[in-house]
Amino acid sequence: MHNLETPRLKLGVFNPLDSLGQALIAAALHRQHEVSALLDDLNGITARPGLRCKLGSLESVETVKQAIAGLDAVFACLGGERQEDLPARCGCLIDGALALGDAGAPGLFLVGRWEWLVDSDDSGDEALGAGLRRSLDASGLDWTLVEMPPLAAGLRVDDFSGEATTIGSEARRALDCAEALLDELRLGLHRHQCLRLRGANGGRD
């Protein structure tokens, strides 16, 4: 039964097979949110109660628009993307959200490795990130960059089930990060900023 005191949100996760994506799904379902895994192969993920699967990728504006329509917030797990591909992927995400109009655009959480964007000493990195920063600043969207710590690869939703004392340390690390992201979604303390997740206990900066 749904806890009526908890707002039920419709959340989407791009790259849901990423370890953090799996942790987000587990944490969001535990909080009784409705979760959509956004991926280009609907057979690539195990069905479970409360989890929906929708076709979606960050390859084009139109596929993004169709995937995120009707969602309250979208988490794009970009840790596995090549740095040079990030501006294009993020551009499709931003433009897809803008195409839904002000009333329909979800909040965006761009989760990845952003040192090169926020603390760059390299002129090439600085030039690469300039367009992305302009796009984010000019979009008017509700967005948050999230700097994620290194996480173990290959974690799955079932790794996060059970009591806190029975979850492995690597799974606990990923789950703590996911819980911190869901707290940020609720509190909105880092809108239009870069949120740095620390590894231990999902700490935030």
What feature does the model see in each segment?
Residues A37-G44, M148-L151:
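Short, polar loop motifs at secondary-structure junctions
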